[in-house]
């Protein structure tokens, strides 16, 4: 701005020579002399601004309004202007000014629990063991154990229902604690609890922070061993009940001779033997009914040796009229080259055309008959030629 005025005047002389001293701003060293001790604004602000006509005329409106506000501040009372002064520094005040803050310190009990009320680092088994060992008689009741823990550890004075349940469970499910009934001389409520005589090495060097090993009573171990030994026998008996004699899994390892011996003790087998006559060819109505009942009793899953053993000597099965058309009949299972041989043999034995014989059972069949005291009245041709040429493939019976 000053350079612009100098260019308009085009006068090389100094700017200070054009105005008098009372028409110019006074220096800052002169303004400090008129400032009061409790104020930061001078009282003659309005006089200074009015003595500068060249600035008041050239300044815009907002600047003049600011000057008016400054002038109004000068006319305010001296006390109000002093209240606007900036706050003094804290260094000017003595240290006693902040002493009141120490009175509002936080109570340590509100945010940090006392060490005496902290949870003890012992398990419930350790607490019970310590309580019993310090007792004079080395035995305590349940209520005495509760009271000992509460007196020694203030932490357990709260939530008593929770940790007392844990104490009861520890006493019941650990072999190191033995329940002792009350004697007649000491009547009262509740039994005594003591330590097992062999549980002395449960803690290392008397340190109850951690157990060395879990104590297990030898009697309980032997009881578990007996249960394990008896268990397979029970399972075997159950399997025998579920799978009767004569089914595939049992009859596969049984011989026809052994099956006949067992079948003789069976009620069905005995009735068949009693109904059977001296001749295997002659059948009575009673034996036919027994044979039919035995067929209904044992389904298709029966193996041949087990089936023959249960039926006994009555091997004359009831003829199925639809066996020729059945998909699993003997005519469907036999090969074409053996059809003619089978037809010739059936013509030679017209009375035994409904019998089903196997070559591998011929010797066992005679043994069974001789053991039971039955006379086998068969022709020599049947013994020599018929069983040697019979088809030996297993056949599914059509019931």
Swiss-Prot record:
<dbReference type="GO" id="GO:0030900">
    <property type="term" value="P:forebrain development"/>
</dbReference>
<feature type="compositionally biased region" description="Basic and acidic residues">
    <location>
        <begin position="219"/>
        <end position="234"/>
    </location>
</feature>
<keyword id="KW-0805">Transcription regulation</keyword>
<comment type="function">
    <text>Transcriptional repressor involved in embryonic nervous system development. Plays a role in the induction and patterning of the anterior-posterior neural axis. Involved in the establishment of floor plate differentiation from neural plate cells during gastrulation. Binds the anf1 promoter sequence to restrict expression of anf1 to the anterior of the neural plate, thereby patterning the forebrain. Can bind to the HNF-3-alpha DNA target sequence. Cooperates with t/bra in a dose-dependent manner to specify dorsal mesoderm formation, including notochord.</text>
</comment>
<dbReference type="GO" id="GO:0043565">
    <property type="term" value="F:sequence-specific DNA binding"/>
</dbReference>
<dbReference type="GO" id="GO:0045892">
    <property type="term" value="P:negative regulation of DNA-templated transcription"/>
</dbReference>
<dbReference type="GO" id="GO:0009948">
    <property type="term" value="P:anterior/posterior axis specification"/>
</dbReference>
<feature type="DNA-binding region" description="Fork-head">
    <location>
        <begin position="119"/>
        <end position="213"/>
    </location>
</feature>
<dbReference type="Pfam" id="PF09354">
    <property type="entry name" value="HNF_C"/>
</dbReference>
<keyword id="KW-0221">Differentiation</keyword>
<dbReference type="InterPro" id="IPR018122">
    <property type="entry name" value="TF_fork_head_CS_1"/>
</dbReference>
<protein>
    <recommendedName>
        <fullName>Forkhead box protein A4-A</fullName>
    </recommendedName>
</protein>
<dbReference type="InterPro" id="IPR036390">
    <property type="entry name" value="WH_DNA-bd_sf"/>
</dbReference>
<dbReference type="GO" id="GO:0001840">
    <property type="term" value="P:neural plate development"/>
</dbReference>
<keyword id="KW-0804">Transcription</keyword>
<dbReference type="GO" id="GO:0009653">
    <property type="term" value="P:anatomical structure morphogenesis"/>
</dbReference>
<dbReference type="GO" id="GO:0001707">
    <property type="term" value="P:mesoderm formation"/>
</dbReference>
<dbReference type="Pfam" id="PF00250">
    <property type="entry name" value="Forkhead"/>
</dbReference>
<dbReference type="InterPro" id="IPR001766">
    <property type="entry name" value="Fork_head_dom"/>
</dbReference>
<keyword id="KW-0524">Neurogenesis</keyword>
<keyword id="KW-0539">Nucleus</keyword>
<dbReference type="GO" id="GO:0005634">
    <property type="term" value="C:nucleus"/>
</dbReference>
<feature type="compositionally biased region" description="Polar residues">
    <location>
        <begin position="267"/>
        <end position="277"/>
    </location>
</feature>
<keyword id="KW-0217">Developmental protein</keyword>
<feature type="region of interest" description="Disordered">
    <location>
        <begin position="219"/>
        <end position="290"/>
    </location>
</feature>
<keyword id="KW-0678">Repressor</keyword>
<dbReference type="GO" id="GO:0030154">
    <property type="term" value="P:cell differentiation"/>
</dbReference>
<dbReference type="GO" id="GO:0000981">
    <property type="term" value="F:DNA-binding transcription factor activity, RNA polymerase II-specific"/>
</dbReference>
<dbReference type="GO" id="GO:0006357">
    <property type="term" value="P:regulation of transcription by RNA polymerase II"/>
</dbReference>
<dbReference type="InterPro" id="IPR018533">
    <property type="entry name" value="Forkhead_box_C"/>
</dbReference>
<dbReference type="GO" id="GO:0019904">
    <property type="term" value="F:protein domain specific binding"/>
</dbReference>
<dbReference type="InterPro" id="IPR050211">
    <property type="entry name" value="FOX_domain-containing"/>
</dbReference>
<dbReference type="InterPro" id="IPR030456">
    <property type="entry name" value="TF_fork_head_CS_2"/>
</dbReference>
<dbReference type="Pfam" id="PF08430">
    <property type="entry name" value="Forkhead_N"/>
</dbReference>
<dbReference type="GO" id="GO:0006355">
    <property type="term" value="P:regulation of DNA-templated transcription"/>
</dbReference>
<keyword id="KW-0238">DNA-binding</keyword>
<dbReference type="GO" id="GO:0000978">
    <property type="term" value="F:RNA polymerase II cis-regulatory region sequence-specific DNA binding"/>
</dbReference>
<dbReference type="InterPro" id="IPR036388">
    <property type="entry name" value="WH-like_DNA-bd_sf"/>
</dbReference>
<dbReference type="GO" id="GO:0003700">
    <property type="term" value="F:DNA-binding transcription factor activity"/>
</dbReference>
<dbReference type="InterPro" id="IPR013638">
    <property type="entry name" value="Fork-head_N"/>
</dbReference>
């Amino acid at each position: 701005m000053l350079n612009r005025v100098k260019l308009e005047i085009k006068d090389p002389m100094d700017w200070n020579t054009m105005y008098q001293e009372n028409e110019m701003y006074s220096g800052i060293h002169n303004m400090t002399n008129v400032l009061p001790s409790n104020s930061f604004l001078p009282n003659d602000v309005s006089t200074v601004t009015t003595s500068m006509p060249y600035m008041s005329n050239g300044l815009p409106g907002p600047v003049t309004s600011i000057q008016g506000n400054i002038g109004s501040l000068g006319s305010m009372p001296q006390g109000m202007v002093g209240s606007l002064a900036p706050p003094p520094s804290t260094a000017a005040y003595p240290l006693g000014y902040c002493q009141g803050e120490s009175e509002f310190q936080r109570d340590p009990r509100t945010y940090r629990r006392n060490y005496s009320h902290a949870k003890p680092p012992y398990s419930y088994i350790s607490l019970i063991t310590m309580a019993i060992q310090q007792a004079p008689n080395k035995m305590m009741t349940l209520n005495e154990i509760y009271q000992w823990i509460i007196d020694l550890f203030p932490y357990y004075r709260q939530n008593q229902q929770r940790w007392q349940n844990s104490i009861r469970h520890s006493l019941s499910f650990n072999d190191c604690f033995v329940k002792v009934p009350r004697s007649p001389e000491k009547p009262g409520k509740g039994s005594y609890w003591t330590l097992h005589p062999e549980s002395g090495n449960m803690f290392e060097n008397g340190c109850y922070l951690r157990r060395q090993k879990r104590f297990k009573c030898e009697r309980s171990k032997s009881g578990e061993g007996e249960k394990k030994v008896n268990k397979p026998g029970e399972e075997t008996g159950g399997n025998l009940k579920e799978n009767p004699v004569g089914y595939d899994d049992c009859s596969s390892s049984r011989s026809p001779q052994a099956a006949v011996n067992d079948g003789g003790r069976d009620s069905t087998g005995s009735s068949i033997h009693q109904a059977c006559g001296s001749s295997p060819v002659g059948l009575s109505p009673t034996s036919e009914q027994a044979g039919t009942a035995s067929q209904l009793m044992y389904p298709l899953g029966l193996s041949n040796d087990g089936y023959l053993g249960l039926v006994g000597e009555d091997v004359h099965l009831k003829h199925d009229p639809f066996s020729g058309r059945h998909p699993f009949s003997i005519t469907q299972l036999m090969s074409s080259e053996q059809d003619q041989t089978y037809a010739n043999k059936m013509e030679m034995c017209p009375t035994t055309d409904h019998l089903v014989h196997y070559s591998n059972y011929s010797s066992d069949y005679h043994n069974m008959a001789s053991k039971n005291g039955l006379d086998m009245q068969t022709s020599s041709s049947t013994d020599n030629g018929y069983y040697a040429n019979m088809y030996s493939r297993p056949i599914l019976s059509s019931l």
